């Protein structure tokens, strides 16, 4: 029998019936939502970091230097950041599950293109297609969870989602290192395509979600302005390391990018159907959560990339050894993210959004080269553990407070805005790595990168304390089920 509001744990209660299809029918609907949402999101988060430790091997095989390494990461992030906001309206227009299927197909196709790449340009193109698909998956999965669970069960559900996706995000460098050392960097992309096939099949396990009361419209002008603004700005930041700021193409790209972003804000203020409803930013907790997200994701992206490059290119560690040092993050996330979500729901998210980023920043400052030699166990591991603790304290409450600050009907766009904020921040952070490191990772530039990353975390902690309020939690009825029994 299907229960009305089961626990969001990822587990299945089977009634004893003959045959696997009968067992599938008895899986609780909300657990089906959790399974699909977590599977598709895990791969997106995993692919966001799995390439970090493969960058040196990719550069040795295809060439291109640090600029190409930055583009391999930023090509993916750029596509996500540019597409995720119009993706919310597109999902409402065509249905969340059909659009999720499109995202799965696009992500899989991009993975195949990247796997067979023979040039840096082809690899970057594959990453762009991956990002296009990924933009429809993470916000859609959070919107499904938000619709499937009532207010009482939602924090634990988001905690479970965060535990698994956070683990995927954190374990990505380790899997990337193992794949590079024992297979090839190309297998990173081959293995990314397989879960997309499984996820595509599982979406037929769910029934279509209720559509909006009004037919949504896609903000084409807003999407174009934001895409041009982000692409031109990131191009200028990355390519300035190769051509210099006195190059007319670089300065022109920066001017075009900034102008397009300013025009985007002006357009959204007067558009009848804006891609970003600016009225949401009058909600204190929504604005605070997104600003904190920007600094936290910028800090973790820059710090993680700096550590991955330094350990291999300067300290001389293998990709696997460099990946092993990331283990504290997935362990902490898997063990404690769900519990942190429940605790934040009881005592409020504010203390977590102050403490978490602060601890993460301190952890990064503990990682530094020493004049008497460098060893990952003594010089990296303590800081990585503290960084992992800080991230697990911050991420679940950050996601929960963003969704809790808006009505359920706006959960899709709220999730999309937060995802776009985090991706855009990560995009800019990666683009700035070359500027801060002056094109080369050394002891001095590595320390400088970690200091900048820590500063981003500290700013996020201050904003979390000043901008976030612990909300009163009113009772909310259990929503309608999203999933339907398998026919």
Question: What does each model-identified segment do?
Answer:
Residues 211-212, 227-250, 265-266:
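Phenylalanine-glycine-rich, low-complexity intrinsically disordered regions
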Residues 2-205, 340, 347, 353, ...:
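Transmembrane-helix bundle of Major Facilitator Superfamily
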Residues 31-53, 66, 72, 163-164, ...:
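12-transmembrane solute porter fold
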Residues 82, 136, 228-231, 302, ...:
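Residue-level signal for the membrane-embedded core of alpha-helical transmembrane segments
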Residues 201-222, 243, 266-275, 465-476:
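Helix-loop junctions on the cytosolic side of multi-pass membrane transporters
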Residues 475-485:
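Short, highly charged, low-complexity non-transmembrane loops/tails of multi-pass membrane proteins
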Residues 120, 184, 211-216, 240-246, ...:
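Membrane-interface helix caps and helix-loop-helix hairpins in membrane proteins
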């Amino acid at each position: 029998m299907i229960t009305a509001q089961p626990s969001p744990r990822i587990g299945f209660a089977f009634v004893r019936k003959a045959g696997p299809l009968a067992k599938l029918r008895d899986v609780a609907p909300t657990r089906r939502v959790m399974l699909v949402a977590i599977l598709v999101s895990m791969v997106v988060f995993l692919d966001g970091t799995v390439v970090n430790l493969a960058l040196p091997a990719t550069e040795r095989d295809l060439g291109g230097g640090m600029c190409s390494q930055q583009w391999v990461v930023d090509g993916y992030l750029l596509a996500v950041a540019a597409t995720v906001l119009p993706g919310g309206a597109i999902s409402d227009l065509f249905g969340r599950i059909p659009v999720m299927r499109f995202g799965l197909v696009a992500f899989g196709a991009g993975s195949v293109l990247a796997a067979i790449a023979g040039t840096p340009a082809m690899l970057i193109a594959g990453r762009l297609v991956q990002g296009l698909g990924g933009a429809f998956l993470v916000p859609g999965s959070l919107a499904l969870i938000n619709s499937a669970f009532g207010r009482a069960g939602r924090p634990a559900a988001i905690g479970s989602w965060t535990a698994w996706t956070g683990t995927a995000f954190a374990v990505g460098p380790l899997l990337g290192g193992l794949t590079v050392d024992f297979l090839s960097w190309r297998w990173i992309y081959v293995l990314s395509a397989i879960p997309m096939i499984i996820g595509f099949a599982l979406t037929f396990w769910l029934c279509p979600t209720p559509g909006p009361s009004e037919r949504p419209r896609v903000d084409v002008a807003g999407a174009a302005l934001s895409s041009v603004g982000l692409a031109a700005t990131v191009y200028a930041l990355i390519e300035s390391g190769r051509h210099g700021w006195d190059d007319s193409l670089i300065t022109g790209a920066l001017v075009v990018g900034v102008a397009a972003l300013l025009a985007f804000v002006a357009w959204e203020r007067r558009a009848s159907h804006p891609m970003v409803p600016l009225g949401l930013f009058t909600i204190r907790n929504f604005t605070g959560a997104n600003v904190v997200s920007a600094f936290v994701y910028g800090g973790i992206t820059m710090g993680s990339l700096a550590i991955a490059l330094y350990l291999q290119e300067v300290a001389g560690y293998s990709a696997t050894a460099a990946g092993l040092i990331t283990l504290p993050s997935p362990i902490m996330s898997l063990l404690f993210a769900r519990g942190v979500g429940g605790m934040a729901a009881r005592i409020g998210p504010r203390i977590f959004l102050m403490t978490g980023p602060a601890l993460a920043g301190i952890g990064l400052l503990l990682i530094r080269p020493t004049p008497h030699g460098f060893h990952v166990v003594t010089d990296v591991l303590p800081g990585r553990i503290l960084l992992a603790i800080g991230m697990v304290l911050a991420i679940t409450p950050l996601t929960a407070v963003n969704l809790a600050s808006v009505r359920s009907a706006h959960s899709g766009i709220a999730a999309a805005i937060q995802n776009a904020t985090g991706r855009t921040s990560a995009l800019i952070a990666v683009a700035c790595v070359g500027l801060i490191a002056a094109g080369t990772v050394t002891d001095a530039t590595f320390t400088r990168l970690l200091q900048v990353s820590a500063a981003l975390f500290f700013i996020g902690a201050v904003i979390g304390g000043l901008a976030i309020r612990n909300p009163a939690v009113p009772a909310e009825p259990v929503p309608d089920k999203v999933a339907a029994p398998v026919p």
